[in-house]
Amino acid sequence: MIDAKTKVLGLLAHPIGHSLSPLIQNTLATVCGENVAYLPFEVKNPDELGAAIRGAHALGIAGFNVTVPYKEAVIPHLLGLGEEARLIGAVNTLVRTEEGYVGHNTDLAGMATMLARKNLRTEGAHILLLGAGGAARSAAMLAATGGAAELVILNRNTARAEALAKAVRDINPSLTVRAAALEYWRELPGNDYLCIQCTSVGMWPNAEESIVEDPRFFEKLSAAADIVYTPEETKFLRLARAAGKPVAGGLAMLISQGAHAFSLWTGKRCTAEQEEELLTLVKGALPA
């Protein structure tokens, strides 16, 4: 029950109607016995983002999740950044201090959980990223810090892929990193790439789209993961599964990164069993 002691949290995004974060965070609050109310706050005009954050701080709002299109745009309006946010160059969680909000990033932890649930490991792996946006930065830094043998970044905008490759080299100069256009997949040697699809292609309502559909692409993979979680299994993952490859969907990443954010706000960390229960609950809320 909301009262004068309720801690208000929220989500900053545009658009916002599709988000599962209110369901996840309010369920976590119930499970963990926290007096929390988590609400969506849509900022339609990017020019008003700074004003929204200043107003939220003045009102005492305890924290936010941040998603598209504000994960990088929010940074100039913050008091500081946590280590992973600095590493990735993007923010998905704000934690209030008396002086302002500090930005954190729980995407890396969520992505690691998504892979670990399917026994997929970055150590010694040849990792192939599709995309070069915020989610791809998280995946790239996971490769850079997680012992990968090689990282290949493919993106329609090759300049963004090259910029991300440079950022990875700055973090881990010994890692072999290549960046190229999406079509470069045809030139890839071998068939042991752990591919992480990091774009929004295939997200509901465009669930019949896949960033790559050629069966020869999937022959080059050892496994496939997709950050998209609506639908639970994207067309990209269906094609990978049809090629006999293990797959990992983005819903586990969403749940895990949400749980890590909740811990930053409240100090409460849910158990692995509670995360599994939450995963089952959220599956029921996905679009048909």
Locations of the language-model features?
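Rossmann-like adenosine-cofactor binding region
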Residues: 174-247
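Residues at the starts of beta-strands that form the adenosine-phosphate
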Residues: 8, 126, 149-150, 176, ...
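Conserved S-adenosyl-L-methionine
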Residues: 145-150, 242-246
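Short helix-loop-beta connector
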Residues: 97, 120-126, 218-220
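Adenosine-phosphate binding glycine-rich loop
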Residues: 227-288
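Glycine-rich adenosine-cofactor-binding loop
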Residues: 13, 105, 116, 124-145, ...
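NAD(P)-binding Rossmann-fold cofactor-contacting core
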Residues: 146-172
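Phosphate/diphosphate ligand-binding glycine-rich loop within oxidoreductases
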Residues: 2-120
